[in-house]
């Protein structure tokens, strides 16, 4: 009987020493983690590490592309200079004229690439892809598009500058450099605006995209400067050499009419854009009447004159131009 009692106590003691249920015991959090949890946690760390490594790899690749673009531009400018003996190494000191000459060569390369890219705009739009195709056709590697950090706007701005220069050259020929008096200044203005808008015709389908790029805040100063400079040149060669308030109202009015006509032009489907040119002529006639009304209002003349004068000077400074047309 004593042995039975001892055995009974031993069984009770053994039960007390057995591990408690993991689901109900306070010691459950101290139990070892399942192997699947450890694997999942390890996999999560590996995934984060892989994402970080991918990010670093992308950034390093972009940095290499930028370096390659700079090197390509350097080699291209040396090639244009016949070996680049005057450019020197990056670490060597250079004088101001040498820097200007180097920048001029880079600008020439940019212009060459952008000229070639224009033929791809009807298919690619005003995009970086068009610039890449233009670079490849010009004999430069595709990574040279790094020379154009502004993207498609560089192409639009180049096109506008090129067209403006062509128009000014045409106006100079018609007026003998501004020396010959224009018989009908109003018709001269109408024909000048028409000639400028007709240059957009090959790119009419994608021109809304170009206008959107020009309207972006970071591009607005250059875009506005190109417009103000163009209307100033048109008015100058039309014979407008006055220094009164009309000098400003005519230029601002012409810029407004140009933009209105440009929007009408994009929606016009008439043969030869005949309705656009009728719209342009009507707006010009209205502008003449408005200018006559404003010329009779002397109260705000000086205020407007100071504001407009500052705007036109700023526009030419942005483009690196002056008022010397000789």
Curated annotation (Swiss-Prot):
Keywords: Lipid-binding, Mitochondrion, Transit peptide, Ubiquinone biosynthesis. GO terms for biological process: ubiquinone biosynthetic process. Gene3D superfamilies: Tetracycline Repressor, domain 2. Disulfide bonds: none annotated. One of its GO terms (molecular function) is lipid binding. It holds the Pfam family COQ9_N. One of its GO terms (cellular component) is mitochondrial inner membrane. The keyword Lyase does not apply. It is found in: Mitochondrion. Residues 1-43 form a transit peptide. Residues 49-103 are annotated as: Disordered. It comes from the Eukaryota. A 1,2-diacylglycero-3-phosphoethanolamine binds at residues 248-251. Its main location: mitochondrion. InterPro entries: COQ9_C (IPR013718), COQ9_HTH (IPR048674), Ubiq_biosynth_COQ9 (IPR012762). Pathway: Cofactor biosynthesis; ubiquinone biosynthesis. Residues 49-78 have a biased composition (Basic and acidic residues). Belongs to the COQ9 family. Membrane-associated protein that warps the membrane surface to access and bind aromatic isoprenes with high specificity, including ubiquinone (CoQ) isoprene intermediates and presents them directly to Coq7, therefore facilitating the Coq7-mediated hydroxylase step. Participates in the biosynthesis of coenzyme Q, also named ubiquinone, an essential lipid-soluble electron transporter for aerobic cellular respiration. This is Ubiquinone biosynthesis protein COQ9, mitochondrial. The gene is Coq9.
């Amino acid at each position: 009987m004593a042995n039975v009692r001892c055995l009974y106590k031993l069984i009770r003691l053994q039960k007390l020493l057995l591990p408690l249920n993991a689901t109900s015991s306070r010691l459950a959090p101290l139990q070892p983690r399942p192997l699947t949890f450890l694997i999942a946690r390890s996999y999560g760390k590996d995934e984060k590490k892989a994402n970080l490594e991918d990010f670093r790899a992308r950034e390093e690749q972009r940095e290499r592309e930028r370096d390659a673009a700079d090197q390509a531009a350097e080699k291209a400018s040396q090639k244009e200079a016949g070996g680049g003996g005057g450019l020197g190494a990056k670490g060597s000191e250079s004088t101001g004229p040498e820097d200007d000459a180097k920048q001029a060569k880079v600008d020439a390369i940019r212009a060459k690439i952008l000229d070639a890219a224009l033929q791809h705009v009807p298919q690619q739009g005003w995009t970086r892809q068009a610039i890449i195709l233009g670079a490849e056709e010009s004999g430069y590697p595709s990574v040279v598009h790094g020379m154009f950090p502004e993207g498609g706007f560089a192409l639009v701005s180049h096109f506008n500058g090129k067209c403006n220069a062509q128009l000014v050259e045409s106006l100079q020929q018609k007026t003998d450099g501004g020396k010959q008096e224009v018989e009908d200044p109003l018709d001269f203005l109408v024909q000048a605006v028409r000639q400028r808008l007709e240059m957009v015709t090959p790119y009419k389908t994608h021109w809304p995209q170009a206008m959107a790029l020009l309207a972006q805040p970071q591009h607005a100063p250059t875009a506005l400067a190109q417009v103000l400079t163009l209307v100033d040149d048109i008015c100058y060669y039309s014979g407008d050499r006055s220094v009164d308030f009309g000098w400003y109202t005519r230029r601002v009015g012409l810029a407004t009419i140009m933009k209105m006509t440009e929007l009408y032009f994009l929606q016009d489907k008439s043969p030869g854009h005949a309705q656009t040119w009728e719209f342009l002529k009507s707006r010009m006639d209205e502008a003449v009447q408005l200018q006559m009304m404003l010329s009779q209002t002397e109260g705000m003349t000086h205020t407007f004159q100071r504001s407009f004068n500052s705007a036109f000077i700023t526009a030419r400074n942005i483009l690196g131009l002056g008022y010397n047309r000789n």
